[in-house]
Amino acid sequence: MDYESIQNLHAGDHFNFKGLEWVVLDPDKEGGVLAITADLWAENVPFSQEYFEGCNDWRKSTIREKVRGLMHKIGVDNLLPHIVDLVADNGDKLYGTMEEMVFLLTCDEYRKYRDVIPKYRRWIWTCTPWTTTSTGDASNVRTVSSGGSLNTVSYTHLTL
């Protein structure tokens, strides 16, 4: 499907843009479409390179910089801001929310769009922490297995 017909897209539709294949999650999201890449765009990327207090915080993560590299490929003018809710799996809201142009899905977004998200050949990161620095070990992050289940792994595991 070409870019000019983006207004006609439906959840689950595939389209090509800027050399990547995308899957529509939400065809009417904040004036555009919310989409995810149809295939893994990178592999063996840790959430954070090293341990530090809060290394599972998306705002401070290594992977955030890797994801932000997609902005240059896609072009900032082709992106719309999105509020990412960094609430931990246990409900702790310490990490807050932030506005991003490119991002990993949260667990809540994964649950919402699960029916149209591709099952990748490897597990993928979300930006949802297991817990935050206010509740103990803040080094684990929620992931989605290749089979589609939500799991928790340490910030250093390699994938994506």
Give residue ranges: language-model regions:
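Collagenous Gly-X-Y triple-helix signature in extracellular proteins
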Residues: 1-158
